[in-house]
Amino acid sequence: MAVLGVQLVVTLFTATLMHRLAPHCSFARWLLCNGSLFRYIHPSEEELRALSGKLRPRVRKERWANGLHDEKPLSVPRDAHFQLQTCPLTAVDALVLRFFLEYQWFVDFAVYSVGVYLFTEAYYFVLGPVQETNIAVFWCLLTLAFSLKVFLMVTRLYFSTKEGGERSVCLSFAFLFLLLAMLVQVVREETLELGLEPGLASMTQHLEPILKKQDWDWTLPVIKLAIRLGLAVLGSLLGAFLIFPGLRLAQTHQDALTLSADRPLLQLLLHTSFLSPLCTLWLWTKPVARDFLYQAPTRNMTFSVPSEGAFDSLRLWVLVALCLLRLAVTRPHLQAYLCLAKARVEQLRKEAGRIEAREIQQRVVRVYCYVTVVSLQYLTPLILTLHCTLLLKTLGGYSWALSSTPPPLAPSQPSEALIPVDPAGDEAQQTAAQVAGILGGLLTPLFLRGMLAYIIWWTAACQLLSSLFGLYFHQHLAAS
């Protein structure tokens, strides 16, 4: 309580509130099961039997008399005309779905994490505490960890199938994105201002005096190489995680545009949401964003060019707005996915021959049973990007205010003060202080700016590439 004070009380209150309100009030459940989404119900066996022209014998004696003691599975013509009934998607129906509880807990935790962050921002703005730890950082870091866990949980489904097609796609794109991640790191800061080079330089400046005192200065190049390799591996994992969500997003985007043919405003929002990763890439492309804004010919127009700090704040606001826009069009995408059941049945009618009734029912049910996985694939990249943006503002020393002067970074502590010089002190305390000094020299604001900006930019790049590949796949490869 003495260390965190009000923030600890708010954290405990939020955790209790999340636990108590989950059965009664849940944003995740409202987003999916408020009644605006509808699902298709598969035809019953009696309906399909009536379409096939075969009536089921009612008594066992009659079945033996007709030689049906070894009854074959019911089959119907593929072009049989039957209607799929619809019903609203309710919470009672969703409780039996796989990963629904994980989906509800993860999305609700992300919402409460944003709530804690908003409170701490208001708390720091009003009171301005100096010696308190910002507990919203831990909430955001936990949300990032849970996002990676959800990615692993969903991607593991593709590795557990008997067919190796999905597994091969994940591994192939993981290798491709590994190469691209290494190429991105060698792009000059004049082109892509992610801040990796200034961040590594700041880390080197702070760590070098500490490592020299311990005769560990030879590890400095190894640390820099390990950081770059770690970023490349992280980029490869994110690429493998986002390839199938990108393919799914491309399909639901096309279907959502078809369903909203008479709603031009919704189509505009869908197009803007689909291209939002491209806007994120532009925000860190210096010739496109910053240089164009500062060096564009103004002619007779009079307007004030934003400062460096104002541009950084504007970039944060744009990222938050793009995340909210993608959240706003969640239901059109989910409804477009649920309508795949009808599309699969209509595609079945174009084929010749017969098909088992059970397979027809499975084609319809599989779409509904997979809706929570599709929801996680859609929302997890959004949650990851949003919380990285919040961390970028806090740990990177930025400000939400579009002020004319950039906010000053916190002064760095001298390296001599990070290591105790009292020889009579406890050896364990000295070791802990040395580790804290190394971590303090490593996690500088400039370094954290570069790391978080890289994650945000790379997530957007993976989403854009995978969704564009999905458009090409569904329009050309899948059709053929």
Swiss-Prot record:
Cell location: Membrane
Membrane-spanning intervals of the chain: 99-119, 135-155, 167-187, 225-245, 264-284, 305-325, 371-391, 451-473
Signal peptide as annotated in the record: 1-28
Chief localisation class: membrane
Glycosylation site positions: N34
The entry's keywords: Glycoprotein, Membrane, Signal, Transmembrane, Transmembrane helix
Lineage: Eukaryota, Metazoa, Chordata, Craniata, Vertebrata
Gene name of the record: Tmem161a
Similarity comment: Belongs to the TMEM161 family.
Record topological domains on the Extracellular side: 29-98, 156-166, 246-263, 326-370, 474-480
Source organism of the structure: Mus musculus
Cytoplasmic-side segments: 120-134, 188-224, 285-304, 392-450
GO biological process: cellular response to oxidative stress; cellular response to UV; negative regulation of intrinsic apoptotic signaling pathway in response to DNA damage; positive regulation of DNA repair; response to retinoic acid
Cellular component GO terms, alphabetical: membrane
Superkingdom of the source species: Eukaryota
Protein name according to UniProt: Transmembrane protein 161A
Task performed by this protein: May play a role in protection against oxidative stress. Overexpression leads to reduced levels of oxidant-induced DNA damage and apoptosis.
